[in-house]
Amino acid sequence: MPFKVAIVGRPNVGKSTLFNRLVGRRIALVDDTPGVTRDRRVHSARLLDLRFDVIDTAGLEEAAAPTLAGRMRAQTETAIDEADLVLFMIDARAGLMPDDRAFAEVVRRKGKPVVLVANKTDVRGTDAGVLEAFALGLGDPVAVSAEHGQGMVELRDAIAEFAGQAEEEERVTEEETVLIGEDIDPDSEEARYDPTKPIRIAVVGRPNVGKSTLINALIGEERLLTGPEAGITRDSISVDWHWRGREIKLFDTAGMRRKARVQEKLEKLSVGESLRAIRFAEVVIIVFDATMPFEKQDLQIADLIVREGRAPVIAFNKWDLIENRQEKLAELREKTDRLLPQARGLRSVPISAETGRGLDQLLEAAVSTHVVWNRRVPTGPLNRWLEAASTQHPPPAVSGRRLKVKYMTQVKTRPPGFVLSCSRPEAMPQSYIRYLVNGLRESFDIFGVPIRISLRASENPYAGKARKRT
């Protein structure tokens, strides 16, 4: 039996939009009017490498049993009973409502595993709604935008904990794969980069490296409190801004220290806010102090950003204090590639937030990295490259049998993610995966962002069949 996931919540929080997103096409009717969905609807769904059945439900409402609303509620409760996992959805834009609290209790009484989903986080002013969701006692909320596909990787990870599925078991094709991080376009098979959409940029770094000074310099006003004392910024502050006609949402964050040094309760909350800002962001500018770069905490922050799948850019701040600048920049960029190989080619820009030096170049790097982060490689060129790469450097033999690579497809962007069909994926050495990742970077210009490759076993069409005699 397929793993079943029910999407529930009060009316008009975006359940049907998420249903359509998971199914991969517009099946459920979506409208701003509450109560559009009346019956529960079941369909097979795919989220990256996870396959399951998803159930769309009517909005939970208080109503007498004989009424239409009461019968709709009964359908929803039946869906919860049938499901293996409940996605309890709230509207982060509207904030927590009394009905959310009441229906959270209904779901809790059912005793089913629950993932709390905070929807509509792609608009300004939703951070408070996400934080309010903790009060429901259903665990940490997963922030998503069902309409725009944001947060789908995090949702996949949350579902996978309960589904027990980590590897894709069937052939994934571009036509079947749910669109991640891009709008569903019913008229187009190929998602394209949209330069009119806002870019969410978080500015992170150790305490007192100049994050708030940098944002003030970028927007040209004293919007954020700055000073020589470490830790002035206590929470994640967002600033809406335009640069060369492009809408940008900037997040300043609290300085991120090593865990052992995070003692004060308020500072722990501040670091938690910084982590959430990273997850909300698309591009993350990591501010290094150029006078003492590559501290252990700098590298830990950079590694976290890459693991979260964000698009990193390094700003070497306080460049006005550096002597022998050309030699120093070459040295820092060489160190960047050596110490952060998981995002080889990462863009780094020398700046001075105090004097304004290098700020345009920093924003140019952020926008170009965002384009690469959204890059999609067509299947034809991808597999021609794979054939050439595996011919030039075949996979090794393991236990006397040579491994074979068969086919590759890109299953997501933001960051680029690929599935490689091969024989015996469990035996494929990491060194060969790194070879393929480096080849993808070189051949398709995917420098400076994480690249993820998942392996799946290729199908043997003769498996289980008796060999025919000639």
UniProtKB/Swiss-Prot annotation:
GO biological process terms on file: ribosome biogenesis
Annotated InterPro entries: G_ENGA (IPR031166), GTP-bd (IPR006073), GTPase_Der (IPR016484), KH_dom-like (IPR032859), KH_dom-like_a/b (IPR015946), P-loop_NTPase (IPR027417), Small_GTP-bd (IPR005225)
Highest rank taxon of the organism: Bacteria
Binding residues for GTP 1: 9-16, 56-60, 119-122
Entries under NCBIfam families matching the protein: GTPase_EngA, small_GTP
Lineage: Bacteria, Pseudomonadati, Pseudomonadota, Alphaproteobacteria, Hyphomicrobiales
Family statement drawn from the similarity comment of this UniProt entry: Belongs to the TRAFAC class TrmE-Era-EngA-EngB-Septin-like GTPase superfamily. EngA (Der) GTPase family.
Chain positions recorded as GTP 2 binding sites: 205-212, 252-256, 317-320
Span of domain KH-like: 375-459
Pfam families recorded: KH_dom-like (PF14714), MMR_HSR1 (PF01926)
Residue span(s) of domain EngA-type G: 3-167, 199-374
Keywords associated with the record: GTP-binding, Nucleotide-binding, Repeat, Ribosome biogenesis
Keyword GTP-binding: yes
Keyword Cell cycle: no
Protein name: GTPase Der
PROSITE patterns linked to this entry: G_ENGA
The protein's role, per its UniProt record: GTPase that plays an essential role in the late steps of ribosome biogenesis.
Molecular-function GO terms, alphabetical: GTP binding
Gene for this chain: der
